[in-house]
Structure formats: C-alpha cells, structure tokens
C-alpha cells in the first residue's frame, strides 16, 4: 500500500493517507526547545531534553495510538458533527475525509477536507525561540 512520496522540489515527505501502519514523525525545534509531531498531529514538546524536559505529556508505550497531540477540532454548529483538522483522534471514514501531511525541514503542514470544510495547520518552532506555533486556516468551500 502506498502512503506517500518524497516531493523533490519542496524537499518534503508527503503523506497522502493518514492511516499509516505507525506514526510517521518529524522533528521541529531549536537548541532550547523541541517538538516531535506525527502525520496525525500526535507527539510531544520538550525544553532542552526530550527525556527530562517534556511539556506535553506523552506515553512512549502509547505510540500505537499516537496520542496525545496537537489537535484542532472543527464543529458544524447546525448538525453538531465534529472532526479534527488531523485525521486523529476523531478518525472520520476515509471515504469522506481527505488528508495530506507534509513533513519538511523543521515544519509540518497537515491539510484536510471534510464536509466541504478545508483546514490547513502549520506547525513549527521559530528559529532560536522556545515556543511552537500552530497556524490554522479553515475555509468553508460551500459558501
């Protein structure tokens, strides 16, 4: 089964299916602050040391579940239905939910579309800083 490909022009690994056999992760960071993020926004953040300086709780024996993580939830106020900008943790049916993850050097972009709502979340650590940015863009394509 094909889960993605390398984009030579943009120097990114592009994951085209969110249901990978295990979490495919990327490292974001600076010397003082780091983060590990998977193709479904799972992972953790840490200051200086991934072993001793964790900021976001992460259970290494929970890797198969790829949780907790950096989840952005989206809700349709009319129907009450909700989903996440990354496939996990809600895991809507793949026949209806489209997703793409682009792991680049020091950034990850997760894009999705469900029920005519597009989302794109860029995750990165600004160079030399001790925080991470989650920049979200949500577009209703039905209007």
Briefly describe each language-model feature range:
Residues 1-143:
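Anionic coordination/interaction segments
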């Amino acid at each position: 089964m094909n889960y993605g490909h390398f984009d030579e022009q943009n120097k990114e690994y592009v994951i085209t299916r969110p249901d990978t056999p295990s979490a495919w992760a990327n490292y974001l960071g600076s010397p003082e602050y780091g983060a590990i993020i998977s193709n479904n926004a799972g992972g953790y953040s840490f200051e200086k040391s991934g072993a001793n300086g964790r900021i976001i709780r992460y259970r290494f024996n929970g890797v198969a579940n790829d949780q907790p993580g950096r989840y952005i939830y989206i809700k349709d106020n009319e129907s009450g239905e909700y989903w996440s900008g990354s496939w996990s943790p809600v895991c809507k049916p793949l026949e209806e939910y489209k997703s793409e993850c682009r792991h680049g050097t020091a950034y990850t972009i997760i894009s999705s579309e469900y029920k005519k709502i597009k989302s794109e979340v860029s995750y990165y650590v600004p160079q030399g800083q001790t925080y991470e940015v989650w920049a979200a863009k949500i577009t209703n394509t039905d209007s």
